[in-house]
């Protein structure tokens, strides 16, 4: 049965309510103390676990304590320091390039708009939304693999394209819940709605999910 917008919105509100009860302490799992550190951490997290990234960050931020330090780092040395995170050569170029752009174009401060953020080397909508929501308090949703999979299973999204999903979800969920929703869905995807072995019988959303395995 095709749901109308009122029914979809009501189901979305209930999903948020149940997830908040299940994951009251959900938050960004990357460790950072300022917007630039989160930018670096998010670049490193591509195709890498947050746990592995967090293992690398303390020594990395000790070696490069500022935007300027990253901007003028020795690229080969930086690449080796982030080697455990994978794709180290490309990530090093992105980190240095974005840091240099922040120095040259933004006075050493991470910009606070989507338009300016996605102009930085290595920064896409996912990283930009993470920074906007976490550091600057703007309503935003990070569309990662968990969000793509679970929102399609819940039939709140009908695409695999992150930007299209982001726009679809903005129409469904209350703006006040966007940032928190991302973290709760990620936690749910790691703990219960696991890609290859979803534990539907343990899922708090099983009565609301059209894709539940009975």
Where are these regions (language model features)?
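Catalytic cores of DNA base-excision repair glycosylases
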Residues: 2-214
């Amino acid at each position: 049965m095709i749901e109308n917008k009122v029914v979809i919105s009501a189901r979305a509100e209930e999903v948020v309510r149940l997830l908040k009860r299940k994951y009251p302490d959900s938050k960004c799992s990357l460790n950072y103390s300022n917007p630039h550190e989160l930018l670096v951490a998010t670049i490193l997290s591509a195709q890498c676990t947050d746990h592995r990234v967090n293992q690398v960050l303390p020594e990395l931020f000790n070696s490069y304590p500022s935007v300027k330090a990253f901007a003028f780092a020795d690229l080969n040395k930086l690449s080796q320091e982030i080697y455990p995170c994978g794709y180290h050569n490309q990530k090093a170029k992105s980190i240095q390039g974005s840091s240099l752009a922040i120095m040259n174009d933004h006075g050493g401060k991470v910009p606070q708009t989507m338009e300016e953020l996605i102009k930085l080397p290595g920064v896409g909508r996912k990283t930009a939304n993470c920074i906007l929501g976490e550091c600057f308090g703007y309503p935003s949703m990070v569309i990662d693999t968990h969000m793509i999979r679970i929102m399609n299973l819940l039939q709140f999204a009908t695409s695999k394209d992150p930007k299209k999903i982001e726009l679809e979800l903005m129409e469904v969920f209350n703006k006040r819940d966007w940032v928190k929703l991302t973290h709760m869905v990620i936690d749910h995807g790691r703990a219960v709605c696991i890609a290859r072995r979803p534990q539907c019988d343990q899922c708090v959303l099983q009565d609301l999910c059209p894709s539940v395995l009975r």
